[in-house]
């Protein structure tokens, strides 16, 4: 969580600068991102890509829907990166995590290799914040989508 500010005075500012915590807002707790994909190769690739691209994330992995939903129920998750093409159905996970698309429990980014516009439209209609194709997405693209999704959900929660 970013430092919210306050009156530190000159000594506090000096210490903050010495520790690399000044100006306020520079120090943040990493967001917890859960990557869900039944393909072990894709799961490792995207999890490692996020870890290597940015220290902003604590990345968790799940290879199936049941374990993913248990993880989401047992600890705070800031964003989910979800493959829809899984034996248990990625849409099932999406609907569990976003029962009301106007106020999602957690932002969900769909990351799939299936290039079907109707699939993306259906995912967004059911609450996905963004839909990305694996074959044309970089770690930077995914990072940007995660940041935008978390900001959008935070704004929606604040407005309600």
Model features per residue range: what roles?
Residues 70, 91-104:
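Short amphipathic alpha-helix used as the core "switch/output" element in two-component signaling
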Residues 65, 81-97:
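Conserved phosphotransfer microenvironments
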Residues 77, 90, 122-130:
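As written
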């Amino acid at each position: 969580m970013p430092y919210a500010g306050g009156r530190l005075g000159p000594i506090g500012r000096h210490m903050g600068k010495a520790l690399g915590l000044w100006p306020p807002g520079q120090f943040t707790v990493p967001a917890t991102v859960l990557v869900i994909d039944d393909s072990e190769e894709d799961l490792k690739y995207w999890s490692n890509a996020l870890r290597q691209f940015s220290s902003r994330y604590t990345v968790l992995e799940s290879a199936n829907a049941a374990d993913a939903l248990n993880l989401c129920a047992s600890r705070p998750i800031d964003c989910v990166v979800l493959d829809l093409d899984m034996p248990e159905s990625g849409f099932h996970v999406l609907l569990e995590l976003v029962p009301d698309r106007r106020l999602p429990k957690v932002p969900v980014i769909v990351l799939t290799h299936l290039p079907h516009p109707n699939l993306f439209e259906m995912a967004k209609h059911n609450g996905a914040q963004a839909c990305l194709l694996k074959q044309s997405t970089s770690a930077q693209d995914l990072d940007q989508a995660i940041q935008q999704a978390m900001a959008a959900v935070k704004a929606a929660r604040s407005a309600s």
